[in-house]
């Protein structure tokens, strides 16, 4: 029985919450108004939301009320968004708050381990008897949190990396009582996610603390996952015991040192890509060179090089850049199928896999694809409605694949991480029009479900756009919010080549207010033109719709890049770096005119 004052059940955030029997221990706080307590502080949490209660849950007026915001006025900007609240207008009127609602609902304080973290879902925490930390999920949570709360982003990053000191890698998961997946890791996206939140204004003291952990995790991959020694990576699972508490989950030998466990390391549990791939018990890996994992590794190299350079470690930075060049060359030599015009996984016997997923586009996010290959890849495959395009995108396996119709988890359904990483690659290769359409489609899918039933789903049906049509799509799962983040990043984002991108040429009219970046709050407005403010001070004004890329300190080229097909005028009042040159699509160079109010570029098309 509940011993603290307060209800044993009630409506919260659109859900009916029932605390059955023992409630959460008194030293865990779940962001409820009253911390619940039990007689035994070691008793597990028992939070249950029944399927019937989910269906009966009413609309939540408080959540809808905070989901929209009025247009920013001069007073808002001069205040510098001191409240720290992320909000939007126009096409982004609801998405920012909805994204942060699901993240906040799933953010917990674990007093035993003295940590704040945003697990994937409170339901999962109940099933796993306390806050469970999954690897790449938590880094994505940090990316979303950083848009409003850099402190919460750091908490998530630090929690995800905490096990490296003991294990030498970030495990697939760590449970509240200490049990962890000792046999496997998960996609190495930590350095990439962290650097995206740090590149604008790096906190060197904090980066110096976590850099050794990122570096050690990086070393894990070629030490343990180059099974055939060809310089490319394969997912795997080591012959280690993984459960310290067998009474919590029944022992099952397939949970380690198996193809199933290797798929869990990929984070793509039942993906058709791995259906018929043998698991090699001697190398502890799948017998498949994986384009996704190898691309993640290249992204990790690039981010670690930037962090090392920032920390005054030029030799280490150079070493990471050489690693990136090497694995990029191997991916292009071994994993590009010239006949099909796509990057593929490759069996160890030399055959290309014909089970294509969005991981085929990850060489774009890594920046290692030659431009002509990137153009062919996007035109022939990504934008092909018979494969990956359509009303609802991006399916987790090609629409041509026989498993697409399964509509089961990674067998055809849409997942936020895939959309986010593909958008990253499109923008990197200046496929700005396609990126804007992907952002709009991601936003439409997200809002379709949010407006319908208040759900932010773990995954979505790629044919109907519905999230709640299957049992294994958690209704309030934090990374469903990545679909909203794709749209937010269409207006403002940090790119891996050291640029701050602002604006869009194709996205619907929208504005974002209070976006946290580099210790400042940013406001971006997009209508007939583009305008940006930082802490209430004007940064730039463009008379026409455009994608504007401002160089950061790490950019190799300090010219402003202006992506537009229209004539216009851009005035930069305040920029991260001094810039008096600009370049248009096609390479035409502009020289700015300096005045007391800034630098102005004018062009005709």
Regions found by a protein language model. Give the residues of each.
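Alpha-helical scaffold segments in carbohydrate-active enzymes
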Residues: 98, 102, 159, 213-227, ...
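Structural helix-adjacent loops and short alpha-helical linkers that scaffold large soluble proteins
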Residues: 92, 145-157, 197-215, 306-326, ...
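Helix-terminus loop motifs that line ligand-binding clefts
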Residues: 149-242, 332-346, 386-404, 441-473
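Substrate-binding groove/exosite segments of carbohydrate-active enzymes
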Residues: 90-195, 199-200, 204-208, 215, ...
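C-terminal capping/lid segments that line or modulate ligand- or cofactor-binding pockets
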Residues: 181, 186-200, 336-381, 385, ...
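Terminal accessory carbohydrate-recognition/targeting modules of carbohydrate-active enzymes
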Residues: 1-91, 95, 136, 428, ...
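Low-complexity, Ser/Thr/Pro/Gly-enriched N-terminal "stalk/linker" regions
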Residues: 43-45, 51-57, 63-131, 155, ...
